[in-house]
Amino acid sequence: KYGNALFIMLNTQDTNVAEHKQFIEQTVAANKDCKWRIVTLHQDIYGSAEHSNEPEITNLRYQLTPIFEQNDIDAVLTGHDHAYSRSKMLLGGTKANDYTDNEFDAELEKDMDAGENPTTKTVAPGNIKNDSTDEKDQKYLAYLKSIMDEKAIETVKKQGSSVINPEGVLYMTAGSSSGSKYYDLVPRQQTYIAHRWQEDVPTYSVVDV
């Protein structure tokens, strides 16, 4: 707890979501005076770099987001992909397509291979095209479309550059502060992303409460 903000840290290397649910509910109930509720976890469940679309990550997304929404969480701060992104306000995302990690990994490597002379160092090329006749490619593209969560995007009221009392949850992925590792942004920016940025330089984020 800091001022009128409640920070809830989840260890999502522990995959027991029932325990996370219980911990969040108990913590919120014990701190009803807090105006803001902020969760932090490692995996970027609504990120935009190369790990963000992994089935392992999106499966975690659809297990955790209903819990966040039920407990009126305002923002979720994540990492893992070492590339900055900020989501739109999201509410009610639903899983629509099953896909295995093995299937995904093979297609991702093919899709994001920049070769020996990449045209960009921060955004992957997107080698798999919409008109591909390969069945595996089409299954991969269908999976990517299913996790864009377009229907979860909330309409917001703005006052200047500020969003006023929005519905839904904001998800932010931090870049790398140490500069030890960077990941490329995926070639197809997800519909749920409001802004993303990667220039392979150390960055940090500040939250004012």
Each PLM stretch: what is its role?
Residues 1:
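Serine-hydrolase catalytic core recognition
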Residues 4-6, 17-22, 31-208:
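Long, structured stretches of catalytic cores involved in phosphate-ester chemistry, encompassing
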